[in-house]
Amino acid sequence: IFGIGGHPGFNLPVNENISKQDYYFTTQPSEARVKIPLTDSFLDWENRSLASTDSLIGISDELFKNDALIYQLRGHDNKISLRTEKNKFHINVWTRNAPFVGIWSQYPKTANYVCIEPWWGIADRNDTSGKLEEKYGMNHLAKGKSFDAGFSITFHGKD
């Protein structure tokens, strides 16, 4: 039984002509995804919802006031992009076989970075038993079997 995840964080180039609020996320494939809110650091399972990720998700400090945005990816290959219209800077995070992604930035203190975190495991649900073998989102690997997953990141300059 195991869970694993990445924690890549990205500094947002900001200056007098561009602010954190000029950036946005896009996802591919464009489809509705289950969004799982957090309450007191636990997955608020009863309040999960179907969220549209087929349009731009604008970045603001307030976007993260309730902690990370967590989406179920259903293990498909996905691309989460961080970009702006103010220059050609963008980052693509490609996930392979990840069931979840967390998108996060510091709050209430603010910073000019965001994290795009592919996860093969997840925080406890608010109805957790506390037993690892019953934990939601864990990976179970039979003897002699293998687990294959990954993510990659591509960076594109602002010029």
Give the location of each predicted region.
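Glycine-rich active-site loops that engage anionic ligands at enzyme catalytic sites
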Residues: 83-127
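Short alpha-helix capping/helix-loop boundary micro-motifs
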Residues: 131-138
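A residue-level signal for conserved active-site and pocket-lining positions in enzyme catalytic cores
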Residues: 7, 116, 144
